[in-house]
Amino acid sequence: MTANDPLSDALSGIDNAESVGHLTHTVAPASNMVGSVLEVFYDRGYIDGFEFVDNGKAGRFEVELKGAINECGPVNPRYSVGADGFEQWEKRYLPARDYGSLVVTTSHGIMSHYEAREAGIGGQVIAYVY
């Protein structure tokens, strides 16, 4: 099986593992973008942690789940959003105001939309989690 979109594959695997109650999930192949998105999930309290395992190829992430994710997924196509335009995408992808988080790639790195709004910067919405 080839991975056309590693972020989409990683998020669907995590979502499926959470829905059946697994405590861990392996995300392979690893990439910098997937690692940054997992860091946002960890910072926002949706996963217990993750570890990069080098297997001599692309590597993999071992993700420790905690049952806090109801749904997560990629946003395709990746929409550009200004610093004041996150509310429209919150309404579209999140079930309620201030519940869940959008993952945004900015010129300052990948972060949650709360951090981007606080910093006053825009970017592209790449994923959501709640």
Curated annotation (Swiss-Prot):
GO CC entries: ribonucleoprotein complex; ribosome
PROSITE patterns per UniProt: RIBOSOMAL_S8
Keyword annotations from UniProtKB, A to Z: Ribonucleoprotein, Ribosomal protein, RNA-binding, rRNA-binding
InterPro entries linked: Ribosomal_uS8 (IPR000630), Ribosomal_uS8_CS (IPR047863), Ribosomal_uS8_sf (IPR035987)
Alphabetized Pfam families for the sequence: Ribosomal_S8 (PF00410)
Any one GO molecular-function label of the UniProt entry: rRNA binding
GO biological process, one term: translation
Function: One of the primary rRNA binding proteins, it binds directly to 16S rRNA central domain where it helps coordinate assembly of the platform of the 30S subunit.
Family note: Belongs to the universal ribosomal protein uS8 family.
Complex and partners: Part of the 30S ribosomal subunit.
Name assigned to this protein: Small ribosomal subunit protein uS8
Species whose genome carries this gene: Halobacterium salinarum (strain ATCC 29341 / DSM 671 / R1)
